[in-house]
């Protein structure tokens, strides 16, 4: 067996903004066309964008405007953009994370490719990976890194 020639991880640039909004009063994460995560002191993380072509970590005005427009469609209160962050997230071709061990490296465990849904799926995926390692329970086929093997 050998691992497929396709790349396991595909870089995907994402940007988010940080807003100040004393009026918002959100106490838990909201996920719609954007995520809104309460931080502290009326600050919120809002995002994110997707860009498979640009692999820089430079913020862009286009991404900022896109998020502001989407945010205005979701909330009905004033806010001020106080920061913007860009980074590269790991994604996979089939948009599924990969978890588990390679056949030849049982002592190396993978937990990657979560992409944009990672923020909401990481807790349950971590539980699945824990049960795989500690309790010998199988990982779901669609998330098992072994799906990349050619038999």
What is the meaning of each model-derived region?
Residues 79-151:
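C-terminal catalytic lobe of FAD-dependent flavoproteins
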Residues 1-106:
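Active-site substrate-recognition segment that forms the wall
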């Amino acid at each position: 067996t050998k691992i497929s020639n396709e790349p396991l991880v595909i870089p995907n640039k994402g940007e988010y903004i940080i807003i100040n909004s004393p009026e918002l009063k959100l106490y838990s994460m909201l996920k719609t066309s954007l995520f809104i995560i309460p931080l502290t002191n009326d600050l919120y993380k809002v995002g994110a964008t997707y860009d498979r072509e640009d692999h820089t970590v430079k913020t862009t005005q286009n991404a900022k405007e896109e998020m502001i427009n989407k945010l205005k469609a979701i909330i009905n209160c004033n806010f001020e953009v106080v920061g913007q962050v860009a980074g590269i997230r790991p994604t996979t071709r089939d948009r599924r994370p990969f978890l588990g061990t390679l056949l030849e490296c049982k002592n190396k465990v993978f937990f990657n490719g979560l992409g944009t849904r990672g923020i909401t799926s990481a807790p349950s995926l971590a539980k699945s990976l824990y049960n795989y390692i500690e309790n010998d329970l199988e990982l779901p086929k669609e998330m098992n890194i072994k799906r990349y093997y050619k038999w």
